[in-house]
Amino acid sequence: MKDLLKFLKQQSKTEEFDGIKIGLASPDLIRSWSFGEVKKPETINYRTFKPEREGLFCARIFGPVKDYECLCGKYKRLKHRGVICEKCGVEVTQTKVRRERMGHIDLASPVAHIWFLKSLPSRIGLMLDMTLRDIERVLYFESFVVIEPGMTSLERGQMLTEENYLDALEEYGDEFDAKMGAEAVLELLRAIDLEKEIEMMREELPSINSETRRKKVTKRLKLVEAFFTSGNKPEWMILKVLPVLPPDLRPLVPLDGGRFATSDLNDLYRRVINRNNRLKRLLDLAAPDIIVRNEKRMLQESVDALLDNGRRGRAITGSNKRPLKSLADMIKGKQGRFRQNLLGKRVDYSGRSVITVGPTLRLHQCGLPKKMALELFKPFIYGKLEGRGLATTIKAAKKMVEREVPEVWDVLDDVIREHPVMLNRAPTLHRLGIQAFEPVLIEGKAIQLHPLVCAAYNADFDGDQMAVHVPLTLEAQLEARSLMMSTNNILSPANGEPVITPSQDVVLGLYYTSRERINGKGEGMAFSDVAEAEKAYRTGVAELHARVKVRITETATNEAGEKVKTRRIVDTTVGRALLSQILPKGLSYDLVNQNMGKKQISKLLNTCYRQLGLKDTVIFADQLMYTGFHFATISGASVGIDDMVIPDEKYTLVADAEAEVLEIQEQFQSGLVTAGERYNKVIDIWASANEKVSKAMMANLSKETVINRDGEEEQQESFNSIYMMADSGARGSAAQIRQLAGMRGLMAKPDGSIIETPIVANFREGLNVSQYFISTHGARKGLADTALKTANSGYLTRRLVDVAQDLVVIEDDCGTFEGLTMKPLIEGGDVVEPLRERVLGRVVAQDVFKPGTAEVLVPRNTLLDEAWCDIIEDNSIDEMIVRSVISCDTDFGVCKFCYGRDLARGHIINQGEAIGVVAAQSIGEPGTQLTMRTFHIGGAASRASAENNVQVKNSGTLKLHNAKFVTNSNGKLVIVSRSSELAIIDELGREKERYKVPYGTVLEKLEDDGVAAGEIIAKWDPHTHPIITEVAGSIKFVDMIEGVTMTRQTDELTGLSSIVVLEVGQRPTAGKEMRPMIRLVAADGSDLMIPGTEVPAQYFLPGHAIVNLDDNAPINVGDALARIPQESSKTRDITGGLPRVADLFEARKPKEPAILAEVSGTISFGKETKGKRRLVITPADGGEHYEEMIPKWRNLNVFEGEKVERGEVIADGAEAAHDILRLRGIHNVANYIVNEVQDVYRLQGVKINDKHIEVIIRQMLRKCEIVDAGDSEFLPGEQAEVSRVKIANRELEAQGKQPATFERELLGITKASLATESFISAASFQETTRVLTEAAVGGKSDKLRGLKENVIVGRLIPAGTGYSYHQKRAEAAAKPAVTEATSISASEAEQNLADLLNLAGSND
């Protein structure tokens, strides 16, 4: 029997392969696959259920229906293996050959393959250089095409209608040849000489002038070359023989009641065969042309439907009016072969159930219902029962398990011990969505989950379900235990912070324990150690919050690595002393000697992990959880209506705001402010009123007055339950409490604009009908958004995974000196991210020197850990160059040094780590979370009240960055440049804060002045945009004609008149071409120039501009000539966020992108055209000047005669990533995308490490455009993989030839995924038809380099534990093959097996 098994194993071993090639099948190849021709459309006999002969299920062609048994039953059993029955002609073999044997249909007339015809760009069309319309007319028999013009005036490929053809026949007789249908196209394709075509086009290319024509020729050249190099012949795009799928892949199953369930393919094949047979008969009968033509057209259409139903014309429908599923539909889409069966499979040994809390479990455990465990571990139990001799056979064991005899439970306990199971919660958004636990058997039917891992799973216990999977093999168990165990996944791979931090009840319990209460029972006592404090608490002498003195013992590790104990007395509370009991040895008492909110607990765990390692942290986390639950129970915190204390100041604040609004309303009615300004100001008033109310409310809630020991009144932090929940971070936020006890505030309409009347009531007071109605808008919008955005976010994740899936760490060090320059991130004045956080876990690219010296502080290639970061901070270094995956030089992967620290493990990354997938998950996972978290604040509009000044937080010196300014009559600076920033520098020269200041800002201080903290140093009006003059003089109106380009509005109250410029659209025809502007003139009427230039001082006025001065009025420097009202802003919420991230990663061009200077030089304006200005930049070195047409309505940041640098902003707008890459280089575009993406996530309080975004950017930058081909094979203007070009260039340089030059190109993630080298990966992502068509024509072969391709072909992935397997295979392939001893062929094995079995058979 053993031998027998050996043979079976040998038989099933597939041949090893290194790649998969796709190409066009020639008719001969199709025939060689085939085991016979299918001639009849019959399937199976409805009475006998036997397949019909020569039909679609014929046993003779495709193989027997039953194992080792022919159709008529003459030969049965294994001993007749390989015999072909002389009666029914069926070979006696296994029935599984019906899954692999193909048939064929000989078509009576050739048929075009619809993919090469209709999938754009049409390959047949490109090949013949004809339009798709024309080819279709030929194929569907509407017109003739000339094939052989002979000596006539016709041309090859010319289209002739029926009449033209008859005329030509009369004129030329049979001198020429014209046909219609696929035969004609076949002959045209056959006549193409590929080599000659390539030569002709290569010669023609340099002389072509028109851009479109050149593009077309290049396209065609690429196609013809692809055919030539791949060895495909163009005529193979036309089918003469149609392959027939093996019958078991298009099954037909009899249902009861004489009906059949069948695959749609059978219908489609039947149609083809019927029409084909009819056509054959018609041809034999020599039927009239018109009938034959119609039949041929129908044959063409039926083959089209079989290959890709619905691509041309109406889809063929089945009996139930739904389109039939064609071969193309089988492989594409979510339900297609790729995504349904190859990339996602169903797994056995799994179960699912509802989850509940397991507060008593350890971190590495989960509670598994006994019933489930019994089912999941059945085979193990059977084996154990037999092994122990409790059951003699498997059958007996089965019976025992079914009866659930007591021994079975003992065996189950034994089987389960140390056998991890994997728990998974859908949706699995990141790798922490599947973790391994040791099962603990429990009664009941719900799986128990440890509370601390809920955050990673994003699970809650409101009915969530989870699936259990059992790793079977020893290797699988080992991997589950060492890599996936929940205790090994304490840090999040997205940001390297603990992911098992306590939340909710636990936080509340710990917070409650660590609070102090003035004059609590036992205040002022002193204890000799923590145990004594505990005794006092247990006996009721001192309460939990009493302030006491305790002597504590701390353990610390000194430099020599010895443990040193120190004792000291601390002022603390009884509760904190109790907490210190569970603190692991080696952590400082100060970590718990504070109010333990969620942030503090997270920091505590992080410190514990970094200082003491994994094991201690896991034990500590569990202890924290048990303690937290215990004290949360004891605290008795609850929510009552009286806890929501409404502040007394609320009513006066609301009344004040209402008065202000009335005042503005009056101003509006008297025409002092415009409607837009009024709306904005009203909303600002209410926003700030809301802020004040909520401040008052929080102040009221957070403090309470108590009597201390000396009998005096004292303020202490309140023990109000709601305040404690919010303050500790357990549940709720200030915004939510504001709605409960303050005022609900401003609401948004469904379109996102803010309703100007706020809800002044709160939930405690209750809402009246109108208030309730307004608030339903926001709530409903939130819910609708959530549903839509979850889908969007999932799609974003899928695209990210797809673009990054093949990026793996494959070498130690690529040796590059390049990297990204890191600086602290400063935004809105605050340091959002200090340098240490940005460089932590990175590798230094170039030596960092001590400031002001030549001493090397941090040498190159140092991995910066916490200790190094402290050194960097102490030396106040504010920028350094660190290695990044974007600048990594490794081909087809990245190196360890460029990636740096593995965030989830805390040491440098290992080889074989799939960093691409981790990056995609880290970015995609919060996306989904964010999308699901819009509506929790009930749609309350959170809009920052518009900023109108800069108030500094630190003292220091004022510095201005790229700012132009003028000094006004009061001696103050007025900013007249667009993207100016002011920074505060401390005495060490470190930047402390940085602010963007808009055009028109008035500064209270001069540059290099000292400023004190809290000073307001800059002011501006946020609602209007001024136009400021840079010279003094009197003003002169140009093109300002009342009723034509402007109107006068007089204020009834003040009698002042103001001038409003009309939009171009509102002007009468006379004013369309006019350009209203203000020119400044000197006293003598001569034009004034802008200082330092030869440009006259004239200011164009855009539409809606309001001028408050009259013609010839005098004006000073720095005064406003006009003001332009700004529109109101919509609410910002992640809705803007998620699409924003998608836009960045898709590298989409914004609607009105910023215009950047293409070259460095001097600005001037050329001749104007209708609606556009001509901007000219003349380089200083006298090179070619650059011109650009800019629409007149764009606000320019530059004036005539100014100097600009390449890549500087000329006109404001959103910057397009492609422009940044082209003009400022890779590092700038990387910084731009990283910062923009981070802004969106930071707004939501989500932390993601920059590395992950950089990984995606690296994948977006993998392609380049060849500028000059040098001596390489590439074509100029061709897109190629950067790594390919680099490898080719290295070879060329080694031979002393000219390398190719290239420009990097930025592709969006979808485009980048589709442009990968691997066609399998691209086809399984999107646009399957197009990808496969392109790959087949080029005869591409897939080297199976990425993860996805390997999953699809069913191999281990070349990452993680599968990495070494692929390494070994590569090494084996590199060595010459050693001849194997007595290798045995499959046929020999089969023969031996048959002999063995015959022997066995003759004995019984």
Curated annotation (Swiss-Prot):
HAMAP family found in the cross-reference section: RNApol_bact_RpoC (MF_01322)
Lineage: Bacteria, Pseudomonadati, Pseudomonadota, Gammaproteobacteria, Alteromonadales
EC number: 2.7.7.6
Subunit structure: The RNAP catalytic core consists of 2 alpha, 1 beta, 1 beta' and 1 omega subunit. When a sigma factor is associated with the core the holoenzyme is formed, which can initiate transcription.
Coiled-coil segments: none
Cofactor remark: Binds 1 Mg(2+) ion per subunit.
Molecular-function GO term, any one: zinc ion binding
Function: DNA-dependent RNA polymerase catalyzes the transcription of DNA into RNA using the four ribonucleoside triphosphates as substrates.
UniProt: Mg(2+) binding residues: 460, 462, 464
Catalysed reactions, semicolon-separated: RNA(n) + a ribonucleoside 5'-triphosphate = RNA(n+1) + diphosphate
Protein name (database record): DNA-directed RNA polymerase subunit beta'
Keywords per UniProt: DNA-directed RNA polymerase, Magnesium, Metal-binding, Nucleotidyltransferase, Transcription, Transferase, Zinc
Keyword Nucleus in record: no
CDD domains assigned: RNAP_beta'_C, RNAP_beta'_N
NCBIfam families on file: rpoC_TIGR
Short name of any one Pfam family annotated for the protein: RNA_pol_Rpb1_5
